[in-house]
């Protein structure tokens, strides 16, 4: 079954025959409540953030050829694929984000991987490429289980790749950051074994008398 994205709102609550309480707004803002997104949808959003609001349509099919040899038009197959994947193409080149909001989000994503208090700092602290990222631990509401997420992009100042790692019932999102790190390393032709050794090594402190 294909999933459509759901952005939590009062209208969605009404469809579920639920009351939208003031606290729901806070829950929705941090990704809880009725929000529902697929990894591909999240990858599109992350790419848009990395590009400072520029919208890139998702393309997963290069061409489709009919049995008679004719080619299916791009508009036709894109419409079909987007419907099945629950994607919405906004038909706009850029989203109207305030510059200060984008900057705040980007700096927050930089801090996740590069600042000592970041939830993915231990994974990326010695990584040779600066990565913007966000870990996520999504409560499922079922027996205390949590889905693990990591979304990110690299390099930070000149993005080439957006990435999403999702593990159902995977626990804390920091675990998925390790998978994302290795995928990024592979994409840029880095030695993944060496990357793992460098980023997981325990830092030492030299005491000078």
Question: Locations of the language-model features?
Answer:
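Short, gly/Ser/Thr-rich active-site loops of penicillin-recognizing serine hydrolases
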Residues: 71-72, 84, 181-209
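Glycine-rich loops and low-complexity Gly/Arg-rich segments
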Residues: 54-55, 156, 175-178, 187-192
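Short amphipathic alpha-helical face segments that pack within enzyme cores
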Residues: 38-44, 175-182
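Ordered, soluble secondary-structure elements with a strong preference for glycine-centered loop motifs
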Residues: 170-174
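Beta-lactam-recognizing serine transpeptidase/beta-lactamase-like catalytic domain environment
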Residues: 3-168, 205-209
């Amino acid at each position: 079954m294909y999933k459509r994205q759901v952005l939590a709102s009062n209208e969605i609550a009404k469809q579920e025959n639920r009351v939208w309480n003031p606290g729901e707004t806070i829950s929705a803002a941090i990704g809880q409540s009725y929000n529902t997104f697929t990894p591909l949808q999240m990858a599109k959003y992350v790419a848009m953030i990395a590009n400072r609001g520029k919208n890139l349509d998702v393309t997963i099919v290069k061409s489709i050829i009919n049995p008679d040899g004719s080619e299916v038009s791009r508009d036709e197959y894109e419409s079909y694929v987007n419907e099945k994947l629950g994607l919405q193409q906004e038909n706009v080149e850029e989203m109207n984000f305030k510059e200060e909001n984008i900057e705040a989000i980007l700096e927050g994503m930089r801090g996740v991987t590069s600042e000592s208090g970041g939830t993915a700092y231990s994974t990326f602290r010695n990584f040779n490429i600066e990565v913007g990222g966000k870990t996520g631990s999504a409560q499922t509401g079922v027996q205390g289980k949590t889905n693990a997420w990591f979304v990110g992009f690299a390099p930070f100042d000149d993005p080439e790749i957006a990435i999403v790692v999702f593990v159902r019932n995977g626990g804390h999102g920091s675990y998925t950051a390790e998978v994302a790190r290795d995928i990024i390393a592979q994409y840029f032709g880095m030695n993944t074994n060496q990357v793992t050794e460098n980023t997981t090594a325990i830092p030492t402190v030299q005491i000078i008398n």
